[in-house]
Swiss-Prot record:
GO terms for biological process: intracellular phosphate ion homeostasis; negative regulation of gene expression; negative regulation of phosphate metabolic process; negative regulation of phosphate transmembrane transport; phosphate ion transport. It comes from Escherichia coli O6:H1 (strain CFT073 / ATCC 700928 / UPEC). The gene is phoU. Belongs to the PhoU family. Homodimer. This is Phosphate-specific transport system accessory protein PhoU.
């Protein structure tokens, strides 16, 4: 898990105030701490769902409050920096990217909470085949989250591009699970309630890939200074190439 990370310099401008640099580094470090918390929450939620571990699920649900509190604290720190330092250019982009990133992390934390609340209410050991498929999808998105946090720590745009494309594989895996679940439902109508719950969980997990993709877009924005939201893969390649040629 990325709980402790040596933050790279990112070529931050040398400010007259060393305190400003310290404040920027502080909030970046806090983002990584929050990211590590969320990654652990998600991993525990997937484990609790697969193993039907009610004690672990309860700890995940309880831990969501800590994630929420950290989001608020980091957001408040961002507001203080903007009000006090009036950052511009890449410094302002960094503060904005941090504020947006923690919102995505908080939503991923909410998914972990929902998985625990929903799956433990509906599933039993007889539904183990459903849980195996959901665990596989969950582990895939956990790896995406781990990788995007690492890319964020280094503001590594090449790694961000790779992770951005990885979401297609998550989508394909999700679609395969949906087909499998529909087959279960057609073969045995008694599975309908549990299948519907599994579909809800699968969709929630799939959305984590989208959240990671959003964080990739924030990395693009910080490094390139251009908003890359709502572009497809081919258009993304073109825009990134154009920005590189402008150097």
């Amino acid at each position: 898990m990325i709980q402790e990370c040596v933050m790279d310099s990112l070529n931050l401008n040398k400010h007259i105030s060393g305190q400003f640099n310290a404040e920027l580094e502080s909030i970046r470090t806090q983002v990584m701490t929050m990211g590590g918390m969320v990654e652990q929450q998600l991993s525990d939620a997937i484990t609790a769902m697969h193993n039907q571990d009610s004690d672990l699920a309860k700890r995940v649900i309880e831990g969501d409050k800590n994630v929420n509190m950290m989001e608020v604290a980091i957001d408040e720190a961002c507001v203080r920096i903007i009000a006090k330092r009036q950052p511009t250019a890449s410094d302002l982009r960094l503060v904005m990217v941090i504020s947006k990133t923690i919102a995505e992390l908080e939503r991923i934390g909410d998914v972990a909470d929902k998985i625990c609340r929903t799956a433990l209410e509906k599933f039993s050991q007889q539904h183990q085949p459903l849980l195996v498929s959901l665990e596989s999808l969950g582990r895939h998105t956990i790896q995406m989250l781990h990788d995007v946090l690492d890319a964020f720590a280094r503001m590594d745009i090449d790694e961000a591009v790779r992770i951005y494309r990885e979401d297609k594989k998550v989508d394909q895996e999700y679609e395969g699970i949906v087909r499998q679940l529909m087959t279960y439902m057609m073969e045995d109508s008694r599975t309908i309630p549990s299948v519907l719950t599994a579909l809800f969980c699968a969709r929630s997990i799939e959305r984590i890939g989208d959240r990671c993709q959003n964080i990739c877009e924030f990395i693009f924005y910080y490094v390139k200074g251009q908003d890359f939201r709502h572009v497809g893969g081919d258009e993304l390649d073109k825009l990134l190439a154009e920005k590189d040629s402008d150097k």
